[in-house]
Amino acid sequence: MEDTTFLEGANLAGITTLMNNLHINEQANLEELEKQVMGKQQSFPTDHFDEELNGLAKSLGINFNDPEFSLDSPHSVISKKPSGRGRDKVHGGIRRDSVCTDSICSDSVCSGSIRSGSIRSGSIRNGSIRSGSVRDDSVRSGKTRRGLACNSSSRNDRGYSLSTHRKKYAESEASQKTAFSKRDRKNHYAESEYSEKSIKPSTKQVDRLINHLRSNGDPNSFYKKDHDYERKTKLVKLEKINMLLTYLGNEQISTDDIKIPTIDSSMQEIDDVIEMLTLRNVGIRYSSIAEEILIGLARGLEIVFDGTREIPFLNYRPDYTGLHNTFMIKLFKMRYETSQVVGNLVQNMSPLSKICLELGPSLLLYPALIRTKHKASEDLYNLLQKGPEDPFTAYNEIHETLKKNNK
């Protein structure tokens, strides 16, 4: 290969005139250095590689110009079958199966064949020819190490040739291309299906308009129907708002801070008002349910443990009389928390279950309320029949009796 002159050095012409002499060695001849740089010949890196390759081949006793080491030559010893008793030898002392891979050999080393430029320093690893592992005397004498065979199939298959390797390599390449093509088709179908799904919702309105035009032929009527449908929906939601306002008014719950929408309001404003009124109505109802359930439990404890019954194995007689009054005070301060707890419980319940939850505590509390009223009436009647001498004393006794029975 001929040396190639790099013409980029021409750009340095006259550079010595631009240099500052104060920063340059006085003994240096700038003009001479410029001439050396301008006329320097530089070769490609491949030339250095070829020199190393030729030196390695010479040390191994290989001549690239010899037809015996050429795959294209019919007289090549590499393509011949080796002969011998238990030894696989070829010309030059290189075994047939010592330079091979398991399945598909590379272009440079396959089926025991050695192309021009295939043996390089340190390029063949693990069971092949390493730099310095094959001695000069062993190559010249035709002897190599034993046990460098790749696998048992390469030992037994004496007729394994380069064409077989190429055939297997081509088959593997074809199978890989087939696998890639199948995967690409699958991804393409998945992407197309995803794009269709994403397009369908956005074209729903357009499809409705096209169908309407095909049937009626008047686009204005289509938009008129759509406007009428929206107006009807607003009227239904406004009626729901009026019902909620009525319920909250009966419970004496203020709604002055909520702006009531009209038919001209947007759908979003109407939905926001419905949500606020629903939360306010449901919050009161849910807190009432929690209060009734907990007060019912307190009433049950008062009936069971009134100070006369003893707990077995504990020798303890608890008296929970008046516990429901304490519960009422505590629960009134926690109306928001109780409404949240009940709301989470009844969120997924059916309407029938909600009705049972509303009426269940009342069924338990009703007998206790009736008994309290009857007891208050009897005490007041007995007090009036007694007829105390001092009217102020009678008034105080009546007041204390009513206060006691109302607890």
UniProtKB/Swiss-Prot annotation:
Q: Spans of the sequence repeats? A: 112-116, 117-121, 122-126, 127-131, 132-136
Q: Does the keyword Signal apply?
A: no
Species annotation: African swine fever virus (strain Badajoz 1971 Vero-adapted) (Ba71V)
Name the chain's protein: Uncharacterized protein B407L
Specify residue ranges for compositional bias: Basic and acidic residues: 187-202
Stimuli inducing this protein: Expressed in the late phase of the viral replicative cycle.
Please provide the record's keywords in A-Z order: Late protein, Repeat
For region 5 X 5 AA tandem repeats of G-[S]-[IV]-R-[DNS], the annotated ranges are 112-136
Belongs to which family?
A: Belongs to the asfivirus B407L family.
Q: Where is the composition biased (Low complexity)?
A: 116-132
- State the superkingdom: Viruses
Q: What is the lineage of its organism?
A: Viruses, Varidnaviria, Bamfordvirae, Nucleocytoviricota, Pokkesviricetes
Instruction: Please give the residue ranges the record annotates as the region Disordered.
Output: 73-93, 116-202
